[in-house]
Amino acid sequence: MSTIETTQGLERRVSITIPADEVETAVREQLKGFAKNARVDGFRKGKVPHHIIAQRFGSSARSEALNDLLPRHFFDLAFKEKLNLAGRPTFAVENAESGKDVVFTATFEVYPEVELKGLENIKVEKPVVEITEADVDNMIEVLRKQQATWAESQAAANAEDRVTIDFSGTIDGEEFEGGKASDFVLFMGQGRMIPGFEEGVIGHKAGEQFDIDVTFPADYHAENLKGKAAKFAITLKKVEVMVLPELTEEFVAKFGPNTKTVADLRNEIQKNMRRELKNALTSRVKQQVIDGLLAENAIDVPFAAVDQEIEVLRGQAAQRFGGNTQQAAQLPRELFEEQAKRRVQVGLLFGEIISSNELKADEERVKAMIEDIASAYEQPAEVIEYYNKNNELMNNLRNVVLEEQAVDAVLAKAQVTEKTASFDEIMNPQA
């Protein structure tokens, strides 16, 4: 009977014995394989005497046999003991003498046994949002600005104009790298320049030359400029004002075949806003549930699972780097470790919620989710059919729905309060 020993944390160790006769039988089987293909001078292929095969290939046959026997015996034990393994085990052979029992140790990690607690202590604030006509008006204004043209103006520049400037910056009378440009087009009001720069341009007209005194922020990205006072000599070459398109049928038609009137456009916008709002609210509530679960349930996680998650995050980083997996692989482990650990913890907690509540993906919710996704496309029926025929996509959606149901299970026990909020507060929380 093998005794499983706890070494540290979630690491376990067990000593396993393989009977000598089983080992020798496995070695003989390996030798048969070598005998079939062995080429030895003076003998035909497959006709080499057994003692010569054993002499030449005995060591290799024994290694191959153990490579098969060790994991087989370990996983038989893991199945029998119902071990919830995390990652692959490592083996160390203690005795492998010919004719004797083979004794080896397996070191491995297991997933923790999660016992959910403190659900009633989790506090969740659910925003209650109504999309108003003013919200729709604001969205239409955004669309108009996206389609805007620019007209040259002789008026003084203001915070919503576009200006073309030449500038040359100095610090203590000396020019610095990156501080000079010609025909630089600046969209005012977007905060692209350091504080005080745009404000210094406002009120000036095309053709004017003037100086601006500014100070680089203490956290500026260029080390040599942090916190430094600078003077910029400006030549304002052009001021342009934004010209918004009228809400005509021609303008409305740009936003899809189903938008023929302003009323149609407003309906489409409101529909999209409702979908975006629903996703944002779901995400916000889920994040609060996750934060609450982690605060109430401190659980150890196996290093192997964290390592696997780090590789997933590195892969995602590679996608952001344009598929450069070599560059992503060089990113330090520390960059991903905390996020990876958190993701493993969340996965374990959600897994326990799903298991303890015997949850299964609600197919009606899956269907509704597909229809919601499809409604954003011009041919929703084709999108629905595409999802229904793609098992991988369907399983991904079922997992999303299952997580939503797990969140619902927590909300049923948590302290939930409602708070009225505006559409803009939810969609632009950093604004």
Curated annotation (Swiss-Prot):
* EC code: 5.2.1.8
Top enzyme class: isomerase
Q: Which residues cross the membrane?
A: none
Q: Name its GO BP terms in alphabetical order.
A: 'de novo' cotranslational protein folding; cell division; chaperone-mediated protein folding; protein transport; protein unfolding
Q: Which reaction does it catalyse?
A: [protein]-peptidylproline (omega=180) = [protein]-peptidylproline (omega=0)
Q: Which UniProt keywords apply?
A: Cell cycle, Cell division, Chaperone, Cytoplasm, Isomerase, Rotamase
Top-level taxon: Bacteria
Classify the main location: cytoplasm
Domain PPIase FKBP-type: from-to ranges: 160-245
Q: Which GO terms describe its cellular component?
A: cytoplasm
Q: Where in the cell is it found?
A: Cytoplasm
Q: Where is the signal peptide?
A: none
**What's a single GO MF annotation on this record?**
protein folding chaperone
Q: Which cysteines are joined by disulfide bonds?
A: none
- Tell me the protein family, please: Belongs to the FKBP-type PPIase family. Tig subfamily.
| The record's note on its domains | Consists of 3 domains; the N-terminus binds the ribosome, the middle domain has PPIase activity, while the C-terminus has intrinsic chaperone activity on its own.
Give the protein's biological function.
Answer: Involved in protein export. Acts as a chaperone by maintaining the newly synthesized protein in an open conformation. Functions as a peptidyl-prolyl cis-trans isomerase.
Q: Which HAMAP family match?
A: Trigger_factor_Tig
- The molecule here is called Trigger factor
> Source species, please?
Actinobacillus succinogenes (strain ATCC 55618 / DSM 22257 / CCUG 43843 / 130Z)
Q: Which gene encodes it?
A: tig
